[in-house]
Amino acid sequence: TKLFKKETIENLFEHYLYMLTDIIENVDAKIKDIDIITPKENKLLEKFNATDGEINNDTTAYLIEKQVDENPNNIAVICEDKVLTYKQLDDKANSLANYLIKIGVKSNDIVCIMTNRSLETIVAMYAVLKAGGAFLNVDPTYPVDRTKYYIESSRSQYVLTQKELKDRVKEIPNCIEIDLDNNIYQENKDRPKVNIKMEDLSYIIYTSGSTGVPKGV
């Protein structure tokens, strides 16, 4: 009793009795098949694991838009001393999404986002989803060769970036560079009418790769 609480001893004894009963009733059972968990505990485990629920088939863009409609003036994004309300975020994303559609971005097209940590990163991700595309975030501190590999292997033709990073993007061939600091937010702020399906691609991330070569998934 100095080592264990009374409840612990009672539980151990209950398990021991249950195991002995199981052995007596199943004399040919293998050790690995002997159960020490009581029926009462099994029911408790089943209750804990009862996590079945309805699957929400709404897209990410739709769920954010729903939040915009319900709480337009609530703060959606904070980065350092800058903030965007849900309405401001939606307006900027709509404008950028309409611009992307205008220049040719279609469903499942990969759009690379190479930005410093900023509000524009979130706006760009949201806008790409609204346009029906899939985003690929690339750290601007990566070496040019690595960035080039990501963009080429993902077959991305568009790069959303910022003024201070434009020179890095220019080193990558066959890419349409879009400056987020430009006046692209002056486009139509209406929500794009794009038929986005649940099975459409949403984003790509690159793993380190078991062979040492990053893989996009």
Where in the sequence are the language-model features?
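Short, contiguous pre-domain boundary segments
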Residues: E46-N49
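Short, highly charged C-terminal tails/helix-capping segments
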Residues: K32-L44
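Carrier-protein-dependent adenylate-forming modules in NRPS/ANL systems
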Residues: T1-D33, T51-V217
